[in-house]
Amino acid sequence: MEKNVTPMIRQYLDIKKKYKDAVLFFRVGSFYEMFFDDAIEVSKLLNLTLTKRENVPMCGVPYHTSKEYIRKLILFDKKVAICEQASNSTSGGPLEREVVEVITPGVIIDEDFLNDDINNYLVAISDYKDYYSFSYIDLSTSSLGIMFYENGFFEKLKRDLEKYSPKEIIVSENFYYEYSEKLNLSRFLINRVPTWHLDKDIAIKTIKEHFNILGLSSLGFDEEKPYYISIFLIINHIKNNLKNLLSNIDKIDINNDSSYMFLDDVTQVNLELVKNNNDFSSQYSLYSVLNDCKTAMGKRLLREFILNPILNISEINTRLDHVEFFCKNISLTVTLRETFINIWDIERIISRIQMKRYIKKDFLFIEKALSVFFTVKKLFDKHNFDYWNFDKFEEDSISKVYFLINSAISSAPDELIKRGYDLKLDNLKDLKINANKYIDQYLESERLLSKINNLKIRKTNNRGLFFEVTKSNYAQVPPHFMESQALNSSKRYKTEKLISLEVDINNAEDNVVAFEQEIFDEIASNVVMHNKVLKKVAEFFAYIDLVVNFGYLAKKNEYKRPVLTSGKEILLEKSRHPVVEHYTKNTEIFTENFVRINKEKYFCLITGPNMAGKSTYLRQVALITLMAHIGSFVPASKALIGITDKIFCRIGASDNIAKGESTFLVEMNETANILRNATEKSLIIMDEVGRGTSTNDGLAIAYSIIEYILEYIKARSLFATHFHELSSINHQAFINLSMKIEKQGNDLVFLREVEEKPSLNSYGIYVARIAGLPLRVIDRANVILESLVGREGNSCLEFLPHVSSDGNDKEILKNDTDIHIKLNEYLELKNFISNIDINNITPFQSIELLNQIVLKVISQSS
């Protein structure tokens, strides 16, 4: 086909060969056109009209509305290569064209494509010579970081993939083939690079060139330990796709695992920290409850805090001090929250300016933010709030940026640079606006000089501006007048000044636009010189917005300050589940509960029926512990919490069909991970471990797990189960808890309140009844349960009424019905008698009760 195509299509095909994995937006006039397979695919995804020209499938989108179409393609995890017309053709062939950028989900910087409260991460994973590392970058916020995996590579990588939720991942071919299935990488957009691209010497050279350094040690790397290969993969990827848009990246954050609480991928999911497990939105997550921040920067920092709880007590207490200050000074808190509404996302704006992707409003937003910055400083001084980490030099730098923008950038919609900022620009603007005025002024000066009272300046399309002099005044024509045309009754003249004035007037509009842009770019360059302190301002706003938010929520929700210790306790009084309480506050009052764990008593077994609140209680303890470690007040009247290095939460499981793993195997994998990695300072949450296999196997496994935790790990643990036999475990660290149940006749009331004793019944049949199972099924279950009570043996089936397989099942069941009814009547009578309190009835009441029993027996006998 290529032999018969037009020169433009041949040009398209040549460019497309270089960007096979991207949709090529090929600029043709005022449209971006797509051809061949791109056109077919995009027309379906975006519901565009697919046409054909010379048998070539094609579709297109207007240039001025292209952003929306690109945004939609990015949401489909597509890469988009933008091919622009580079210049006019001089050879008679097609216009020169080149790809100016490749937009992919992981390298978005356009605010229209970004979510305000979520970082947009591109991740690279390297296993070069078994030096495992994980690097991440958010171009929109200029954040670049790396994790070294010196041990526990696989579990840490799973954790970080869940934590960072990257939009795009770069891996080597070898890594992809080895780990794609194990890590379920198909859920991400993957860029595979040939393994031979992972070259240590090229990586060192590339990183040194980007950061303009002599050696990698200044960045914190040992060149003999090539963890930095993942950084190289990121830099190389962005250079290849976005040309020179790495100018905003000037440092690398090297993350230290030991500073943060470990939350594996399963725990992040089970606790629903930043997204729920239904539609994966933030609603019903801990993040949604704690997020009442007013700035995009504060929202992103909250997400970072939740996923990275800290372990340093001093640092936690500093945060808590700030939260307490704003909780107590609520009028200041309200004022700040109202003020922060006026702050735009300057963290991302500063990055765009560094990458030369700025527009006028970006500078106006910075000006507004810096104005708020100085307002906040005055408020802090007034209220004696001592958190201020800017020195005099930095404050002066911030002032310079503010006054530069304030004096230069116009807020008027039809003006870029303010009048008065640059005299030359003002003159150009005046010339553009007052052209006729300047012509008249010059005409008047020449009239006075020549004394030709009827001297005129006229204009034609062919000759432009000229003086017109009538015959009677020829003798008075000044010597600097140059004749340009003679007519019958007059002559036309030009002067050097008139020619210059005409040129200036004709060029004024273009000159204003060009000179304004020159000044604008110069202002941007000046602002970039202060980028470090401006980023510090952005970080300041993010932190203050967050602790103000925490203080506001503490006051509003009656959260209390937790006390963090170096011990092993988790002591909570009147504690509540923050998420459940938040989303049910308008319909019910949340039942408060205690938690009493210490170094002597650290393992809690929780028994009781489904629906009684066991799972809520488990998550509640984990979430409150985590909240304390991020510096938030907690939903409890009192909280004393020992520093917790890891939280493990194994609640519920489902089949992993993709890996061929059953529910039970998934459960055992998760449990194995906990037993391998938990320490004495960890918190373990387990719910229904062992339920996915036979009763005896499940009970044995659960018992052995508890024994292992008690004897070897000694971690603080909450273990919910329906294996009531486990409550007989005898160990000094063991605590039996259960959920209170209140009987009301044949009904049960779940009080959702914890008490220190084991439950002896799971009330499963009752739960099945209120869930709506058919009455016949419920009756049958009661019969079977009664037949099982007190029995012993290898199989419960030997005690059950048999059902044949010869087609007579229904008849047998029908014949059994009377027996079932009689047994139920017997059980009802037994229940009636067992509820009589003989110590608290009068003689008359006893006779009445005896009469009721006789009547029931007669009724059942008839």
UniProtKB/Swiss-Prot annotation:
<dbReference type="InterPro" id="IPR007860">
    <property type="entry name" value="DNA_mmatch_repair_MutS_con_dom"/>
</dbReference>
<dbReference type="InterPro" id="IPR027417">
    <property type="entry name" value="P-loop_NTPase"/>
</dbReference>
<dbReference type="InterPro" id="IPR045076">
    <property type="entry name" value="MutS"/>
</dbReference>
<keyword id="KW-0238">DNA-binding</keyword>
<dbReference type="Pfam" id="PF05190">
    <property type="entry name" value="MutS_IV"/>
</dbReference>
<dbReference type="GO" id="GO:0003684">
    <property type="term" value="F:damaged DNA binding"/>
</dbReference>
<dbReference type="Pfam" id="PF01624">
    <property type="entry name" value="MutS_I"/>
</dbReference>
<dbReference type="InterPro" id="IPR005748">
    <property type="entry name" value="DNA_mismatch_repair_MutS"/>
</dbReference>
<keyword id="KW-0547">Nucleotide-binding</keyword>
<protein>
    <recommendedName>
        <fullName>DNA mismatch repair protein MutS</fullName>
    </recommendedName>
</protein>
<dbReference type="InterPro" id="IPR036678">
    <property type="entry name" value="MutS_con_dom_sf"/>
</dbReference>
<dbReference type="InterPro" id="IPR007861">
    <property type="entry name" value="DNA_mismatch_repair_MutS_clamp"/>
</dbReference>
<dbReference type="GO" id="GO:0030983">
    <property type="term" value="F:mismatched DNA binding"/>
</dbReference>
<dbReference type="Pfam" id="PF05188">
    <property type="entry name" value="MutS_II"/>
</dbReference>
<dbReference type="InterPro" id="IPR007696">
    <property type="entry name" value="DNA_mismatch_repair_MutS_core"/>
</dbReference>
<keyword id="KW-0234">DNA repair</keyword>
<dbReference type="InterPro" id="IPR016151">
    <property type="entry name" value="DNA_mismatch_repair_MutS_N"/>
</dbReference>
<comment type="function">
    <text>This protein is involved in the repair of mismatches in DNA. It is possible that it carries out the mismatch recognition step. This protein has a weak ATPase activity.</text>
</comment>
<dbReference type="InterPro" id="IPR000432">
    <property type="entry name" value="DNA_mismatch_repair_MutS_C"/>
</dbReference>
<keyword id="KW-0227">DNA damage</keyword>
<dbReference type="Pfam" id="PF05192">
    <property type="entry name" value="MutS_III"/>
</dbReference>
<dbReference type="InterPro" id="IPR007695">
    <property type="entry name" value="DNA_mismatch_repair_MutS-lik_N"/>
</dbReference>
<keyword id="KW-0067">ATP-binding</keyword>
<dbReference type="Pfam" id="PF00488">
    <property type="entry name" value="MutS_V"/>
</dbReference>
<dbReference type="GO" id="GO:0005524">
    <property type="term" value="F:ATP binding"/>
</dbReference>
<feature type="binding site">
    <location>
        <begin position="608"/>
        <end position="615"/>
    </location>
    <ligand>
        <name>ATP</name>
    </ligand>
</feature>
<comment type="similarity">
    <text>Belongs to the DNA mismatch repair MutS family.</text>
</comment>
<dbReference type="InterPro" id="IPR017261">
    <property type="entry name" value="DNA_mismatch_repair_MutS/MSH"/>
</dbReference>
<dbReference type="GO" id="GO:0140664">
    <property type="term" value="F:ATP-dependent DNA damage sensor activity"/>
</dbReference>
<dbReference type="GO" id="GO:0006298">
    <property type="term" value="P:mismatch repair"/>
</dbReference>
<dbReference type="InterPro" id="IPR036187">
    <property type="entry name" value="DNA_mismatch_repair_MutS_sf"/>
</dbReference>
